[in-house]
Every structure is written in structure tokens, then in C-alpha cells.
Regions:
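The feature captures the beta-strand-to-loop junction immediately N-terminal to the Walker
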Residues: 52-55
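Conserved catalytic motifs of ABC-family nucleotide-binding domains
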Residues: 73-74, 110-119
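ABC ATPase NBD coupling module
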Residues: 75-77, 88-104, 127, 133
Length: 150
């Protein structure tokens, strides 16, 4: 058995955490209703973080805030900071489409938009300015083939 000298002082230092995201004083409003109230949180890089809570407590609202999915909700307002590599993703000069290449979402249950399969597949491309029908048709066909649905 190892014997310790309890009179000897041992200083243990831990390395700084490398953060994937840092949340500072995050508030989310739907009109006058405050859905998220001042969250401060850090997500460590290469670690799994679980958000647990009862239905309606704001988990989905919080997650949607991380990559600005709440931007599509007219009455939603987000304040505070969501820092990715030191940059606030809520800044007005952020290219949302480029940012979402780095901060993606994979939900437990697929939740397509209330549109056709074709429109769900072409949605992001159309938002980026792709308008050519032949190009969009090719994107849909390729996507469905890759998913084994063509």
C-alpha cells in the first residue's frame, strides 16, 4: 500500500480547456416572452455534452440559437454572445451559411420542413442563390441516390 506524507503539499495543475463554443449571458425572446434567461456555458472541444430537462424548458430553443436557426422565426430575438473560435456568431457581419459549415445540428428525430422532399433537399441551395432547375434536379437526384432512395 502506498503511504502518503500528508504534511507535504502537492500542487496539481490542470491544463486549460480547449473550447468548442462559449456562451455568455444568452437570452432568447419570442416576442415579449423570455424563453432563455442568461445562460453562461462552455462546450469543451471533442467532448460530449448532454442537455437534460423537462419538455418546454428551452433545450431546443438553446440548441437552435447555437447556429442561428432562430433567425428564421420573425418574433425571435437573441442577445448575449455565442463564441466560436473567439468570434460571436450573432454578429451582424457573420456569413450564416459559412458559420453553419462549422456549427451543425443533428437532431434525434429528423424534422424536415413542411414542404415536399424536393423542396427540403433544395432549400439550402436556393437560400445560397442556386436557381437553375437542372442544377437543383441534379442535386436532388444525387442526394436521393446517396441515401438509397432513388
Amino acid at each position: 500500500m502506498t503511504k502518503y506524507n500528508w504534511d507535504e503539499r502537492h500542487i496539481i495543475t490542470f491544463p486549460e480547456k480547449e473550447l468548442a463554443l462559449e456562451i455568455k449571458d444568452l437570452h432568447v425572446y419570442y416576442g415579449q416572452k423570455e424563453a432563455i434567461k442568461g445562460i453562461d456555458m462552455q462546450f469543451e472541444k471533442n467532448k460530449i455534452t448532454a442537455l437534460i430537462g423537462p419538455s418546454g424548458c428551452g433545450k431546443s430553443t438553446f440548441l437552435r440559437s447555437l447556429n442561428r436557426m432562430n433567425d428564421t422565426i420573425d418574433i425571435a430575438k437573441v442577445t448575449g454572445q455565442i463564441l466560436y473560435q473567439g468570434v460571436d456568431v450573432n454578429a451582424s457581419n457573420i456569413n450564416v451559411y459559412e458559420m453553419r459549415k462549422h456549427i451543425g445540428m443533428v437532431f434525434q428525430r429528423p424534422n424536415p420542413f413542411a414542404k415536399s422532399i424536393y423542396r427540403n433537399i433544395t432549400f439550402a441551395h436556393e437560400r445560397k442563390g442556386v436557381r437553375d432547375k437542372q442544377t437543383l434536379d441534379e442535386i436532388v437526384e444525387t442526394s436521393l441516390k446517396q441515401a438509397g432512395l432513388w
